[in-house]
UniProtKB/Swiss-Prot annotation:
Expressed at high levels in embryos and mature seeds. Residues 1-10 have a biased composition (Polar residues). Induction: By cold stress, abscisic acid (ABA) and water stress. It comes from Arabidopsis thaliana. One of its GO terms (cellular component) is cytosol. This is Stress-induced protein KIN2. Interacts with DEK3. Sequence repeats lie at residues 31-35, 49-53. One of its GO terms (molecular function) is mRNA binding. Residues 1-20 are annotated as: Disordered.
Amino acid sequence: MSETNKNAFQAGQAAGKAEEKSNVLLDKAKDAAAAAGASAQQAGKSISDAAVGGVNFVKDKTGLNK
């Protein structure tokens, strides 16, 4: 194998490894974003449920929930 071919091969290997690392990092970022989105959605649901419960409590105590 000539020196030029060897250098081209090694450059290709390095590029392939860099691409694989970037794909792994992108997958991790996607997973983290999905987890954050799910967590935010759950927090929003909890807040909404608490607000509805508070409204119903006030309605019950004031006699408006008939």
